Amino acid sequence: GELVLKNTRKPYKASVLGLYGQNGSGKTALIDALSILKLVLSGKSVPLQYAEYVNLEADNAKLEFTFSITSPQGTHNVEYSFNLRKCRNDNEQNMVNDKNDVRYMSRIYNECVKYSYHSDTEDIPKQTLIDTKTEKAFAPGTKYRLLIGNDPNDETDLIVEKRMASASARSFVFSSGFLKKFKEKCESEFYRQIIESLVFYGNYELFVITTSNSGHIAMGYLPLMFQYEEDGGTRTGNIPISLNDANYI
C-alpha cells in the first residue's frame, strides 16, 4: 500500500493529520513501518518481531519512503527503500542439534537511495545515489567515487562494515561505519545534505509512539517525547506525564 503524509493545506504553525480505518485496515502496520524507519535511520538493530510480520507466503517485505528536503537553494526529493526478511541467526549459536532450536533475526538488505532536485536555476532528474544490491560496498561506481573516493582500503573497510551491519540487523547506509567514512571523504555539500538530513530526521525529528505504550497508559501515565536545543546541540528523550494529576516540567 501507499500513504501520503504531506499536509497540503495552508502552512499552519501546528497541524494534525489523522488516519482513520476499520479494524484490520492497516493503521498499526503504518506505525510499525515508521518504527522500522526510525530504527534504520538511527543506525539501530531491527528487532525480530518486525521480520515476523512478513507474510508467510512471501520471502521478504519491501519498504519505500519518500522525503522532501527543502533548503533556500532548492528541494531534494529523496526515495529510500530496503528489503526486510527473517533469516537464521548464526551469531548466537555454533551448533544446532534440534531443528526447533534454530534462532532467527531480522535482516535489512537491498538498500537504495534515489534523488531528484529542483531549484529556480537547475533541475536534476531522478537518479540513483546509493544501491547496495551488489557484491561491492555499493553502486553506481560514479557516485561511489564522488562519495568515498578511489582508495581501495576504503572499499575494503566498507565491505566489512556492510557485512557487520547485515549480521546485526542494521542498515549499512546509516551505520556508524559508513557515515564516518562518508563524512571524511565526501566533499560535496549537495550529497552531504541528502544523507545528513535523513540521519538528523531519524534521530531528532521522527517520534513514534507504538502500541507498547498502552501498558504505560494503563498505569496512569503517558510517555512524552521531546526535543530541545542547548549549547549548539540537539537532545531528545521522553518523560512520564501523569494522566491523573497536574504535571510540573
Regions found by a protein language model. Give the residues of each.
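Electropositive, glycine-dotted interaction segments
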Residues: 85-248
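Short, flexible loop/turn elements at secondary-structure junctions
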Residues: 23, 67-71, 84-88
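AAA+/P-loop NTPase substrate/partner-engagement loops
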Residues: 49-71
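Short, surface-exposed coil-to-beta transition loops
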Residues: 75-81
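A short, structural micro-pattern
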Residues: 59, 76, 105-107
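Pre-Walker A-like glycine/lysine-rich segment at the N-terminus of P-loop NTPase domains
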Residues: 1-35
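Post-Walker A helix-loop "phosphate-sensing" segment adjacent to the P-loop in P-loop NTPases
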Residues: 37-48
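Extracellular structured ligand-interaction cores
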Residues: 16, 60-64, 79
